[in-house]
From Swiss-Prot:
Protein known as: WD repeat-containing protein 89
Upper lineage: Eukaryota, Metazoa, Chordata, Craniata, Vertebrata
PANTHER family per the UniProt record, alphabetical: WD REPEAT-CONTAINING PROTEIN 89 (PTHR22889:SF0)
Gene Ontology biological process terms, A to Z: corpus callosum development; ventricular system development
Keyword Iron-sulfur: no
The keyword Repeat appears for this protein: yes
């Protein structure tokens, strides 16, 4: 534990992205996987103005920007085998761009069913399947699937393979494929349910491996544990759950931890916790960590055990507003963070900042702010109580 504490505490800002022409919240970050982490690569950032910005990972220079118009984009993910970058759109599509090219037009377009509004998605570890979660329309909240493989007779537009419609009763806010098993996927919804599916099974009912209940609207899910046989979940009202799927066929309870509001029970040294950002499973340590923060931009590292969340250490001096996204490359102790101050920061051990951008608090027009799903969303609570 001391090692990870020192690694995190020793992170310092190496670079900030240049001030964009249109300041936006930075809602999601992913890095390209086709080159070794230490040799640089690309960074894709989801912005609240409905675009994805592509940066050089080492310099944080903005290379190009892709627009999701006419829809708003939700989520950002690089392919595992190439530099294609994906995002789900409220216009009922999942869009795929070649991040190396400046073309505004998507390389591929995965079309949903009529009336689909996609708010979450993921691509499996082999880049074969895309799954997107939709907002509830009438009585249906769909998980939609596509074949994402390129062929010699490739079509730029793809229709769905099919959909699951029986396992969620409200908006599907999160989708995450297993890191190494291409057939396993977990989904989370505003109905509070977190469902695990095995896509190698033919029908939806039999494919459902487990249903876990967070009792609140799901904001983040992920895989963890040895062989990634555990899942964790965060909620829009700052709850945290952790389940062990190894115990599905035993008498042992699958719930490892269930905290209704982490802000009430987590003691942060010389500070406080306002919200959760996401989770990180450290394979070498076999330990799950949770990243949280404050409304003034301080970042907290929390360790997760079956007794609760405990504060390890914190980073400060980088952001001036709520931090909304991060991407931590454990192999090189490299951290990327993005926030509501429109800043993209690269942190590395013992770094000395090579560029400087004034980090004033960002004031964003209310029309944009209303489109962005923030953490403590009363609308989710009201919808759930209805």
């Amino acid at each position: 534990m001391e090692k990870i504490k020192d690694q995190f505490a020793n992170l310092h800002i190496l670079r900030r992205s240049s001030e964009p022409k249109e300041p936006t919240y930075l809602l999601g970050i992913d890095t390209s996987k086709t080159v070794p982490a230490e040799k640089g690569g690309l960074v894709a950032v989801l912005c609240s103005n409905g675009s994805i910005r592509i940066y050089d990972k080492e310099t944080l220079n903005l290379l190009r920007e892709f627009s999701g118009s006419p829809g708003l984009l939700n989520g950002v993910r690089f392919a595992n085998s190439c530099d294609n970058v994906y995002s789900a759109s409220t216009d009922g599509t999942v869009k795929c761009w070649d991040a190396r090219l400046a073309s505004e037009k998507p390389a591929q377009l995965f079309k949903g069913y009529p009336s689909n509004i996609f708010i979450s998605f993921d691509v499996n570890c082999k880049d074969h399947i895309i799954c997107a979660g939709a907002e509830k329309v009438e009585d249906d909240a769909l998980l939609v699937f596509w074949d994402a493989r390129f062929t010699s007779q490739d079509l730029s537009t793809r229709d769905p393979l099919g959909a699951y419609s029986e396992t969620h009763s409200d908006d599907i806010t999160q989708v995450r494929f297993h890191p190494s098993n291409p057939n396993m996927v977990v989904s989370g919804s505003t109905d509070g349910l977190v469902n695990v599916f095995d896509l190698s099974v033919d029908n939806e009912e039999d494919a459902l491996v487990a249903t876990c209940n967070s009792v609140s609207s799901v904001s983040c899910i992920g895989w963890c544990g040895r062989d990634y046989k555990q899942i964790y979940c965060m909620t829009h009202d700052e709850g945290f759950c952790w389940w062990d799927l190894n115990h599905l066929d035993t008498d042992e309870p699958i719930t490892c931890l269930n905290i209704q509001d982490v802000r009430d029970v987590t003691d942060v040294k010389e500070g406080h916790l306002d919200y959760l950002i996401g989770g990180l499973y450290h394979e070498n340590m076999d330990r799950l960590f949770v990243i949280g923060g404050t409304n003034l931009g301080k970042i907290h590292l929390l360790s997760c055990t079956k007794t609760g969340l405990s504060h390890v250490t914190s980073l400060q001096g980088g952001h001036a507003a709520t931090v909304r996204s991060f991407c931590w490359t454990v192999s090189e102790d490299s951290l990327l963070t993005g926030g509501e101050d429109a800043q993209l920061l690269l942190w590395k051990p013992g770094a000395v900042e090579k560029t400087f951008t004034k980090k004033d608090s960002l004031k964003i027009a209310s029309s944009v702010q209303q489109r962005v799903r923030v953490h403590s969303s009363d609308s989710y609570k009201k919808r759930k109580q209805q």
